[in-house]
């Protein structure tokens, strides 16, 4: 049963990250997801200091606000200070993440809210943190319910805003001409990324969240040519990576999070090399075959 809880939680988190990560990849904003996953840390700490509790609603609210603030800072530095986007991202997320670490070490050092938990998480402990009702009924791991709720929110967000996300992603100029607010949908997407990130911190940590935001969608991007196909492939990869990572960790008696990232990296490497249309090896083989076909045609014509 523990294995089921761990795999289910990892799968739900991977699905949430992959769903949003697909739009980040298509918008060429993968590093923004990385920035937000680190920069929301001050929001988590400030939410704890204000509320005095680690209740998920406070944490989610703090993270969402910091995620939107991070996006605003990146845009501000890029447009007003004329910094390159990567430089603006680097300055913003390192400063905010360092601020969060200082806040933890100075103000929140007496509680179970530390750098190790935020960075690495520990998904193996998911079955131990149970949701117990007032009557004493055990409903299962709390992280599983949180991950499921966040996934439902993300699915609803993408479903209801699919047309707007599609237009603002692929043709911002046309979307603006239709009256769509590019900034609004950008901030909504970043807010969803923030919620997903903080909901996943305690279970899997920031590093695995970053990997799940980027690796499955990037792999699906190499394997598909349309957005619906990319989203479907991302979902399948999320399930396979989560289950494969758990069993690899069990076989090696190692870190589950590390094994999941390893499987994700292997999947991407295979797609990079052997994807039907975009794989490096596949393209070279196709080019060689076409060249041989042309040579044979010329030879027969001669």
Where on the chain are the PLM-derived regions?
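Cytosolic-side transmembrane-helix boundaries in multi-pass membrane proteins
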Residues: 257-302
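Transmembrane helix-bundle core of multi-pass membrane transporters
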Residues: 97-157
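Residue-level recognition of pore/gate-forming positions within transmembrane alpha-helices
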Residues: 14, 38-41, 63, 67-68, ...
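Membrane-interfacial amphipathic/re-entrant helices at transmembrane-helix boundaries
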Residues: 1-16
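Structural signal for membrane-spanning alpha-helices in multi-pass inner-membrane proteins
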Residues: 21, 45-49, 70, 74-75, ...
């Amino acid at each position: 049963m523990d294995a089921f809880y761990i795999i289910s939680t990892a799968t739900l988190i991977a699905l949430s990250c992959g769903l949003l990560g697909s739009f980040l990849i298509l918008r060429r904003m993968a590093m923004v997801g990385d920035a937000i996953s680190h920069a929301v840390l001050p929001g988590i700490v400030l939410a704890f200091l204000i509320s005095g509790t680690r209740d998920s609603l406070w944490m989610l609210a703090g993270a969402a606000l910091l995620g939107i603030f991070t996006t605003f800072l990146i845009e501000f530095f890029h447009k007003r200070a004329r910094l390159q986007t990567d430089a603006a991202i680097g300055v913003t997320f390192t400063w905010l993440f360092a601020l969060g670490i200082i806040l933890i070490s100075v103000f929140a050092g007496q509680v179970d809210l530390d750098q190790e938990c935020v960075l690495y998480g520990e998904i193996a402990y998911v079955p131990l943190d149970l949701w117990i009702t007032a009557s004493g009924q055990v409903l299962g791991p709390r992280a599983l319910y949180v991950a499921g709720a966040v996934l439902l929110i993300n699915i609803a967000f993408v479903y209801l805003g699919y047309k707007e996300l599609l237009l603002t992603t692929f043709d911002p100029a046309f979307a603006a001409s239709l009256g769509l607010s590019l900034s609004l949908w950008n901030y909504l997407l970043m807010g969803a990324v923030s919620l997903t990130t903080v909901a996943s911190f305690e279970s899997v940590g920031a590093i695995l969240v970053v990997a799940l935001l980027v690796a499955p969608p990037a792999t699906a991007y190499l394997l598909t040519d349309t957005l619906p196909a990319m989203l479907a492939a991302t979902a399948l990869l999320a399930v396979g990576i989560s289950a494969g990572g758990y069993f690899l960790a069990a076989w090696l008696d190692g870190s589950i999070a590390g094994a999941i990232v390893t499987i994700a990296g292997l999947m991407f490497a295979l797609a990079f090399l052997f994807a039907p249309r975009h794989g490096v090896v596949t393209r070279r083989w196709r080019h060689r075959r076409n060249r041989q076909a042309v040579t044979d045609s010329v030879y027969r014509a001669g």
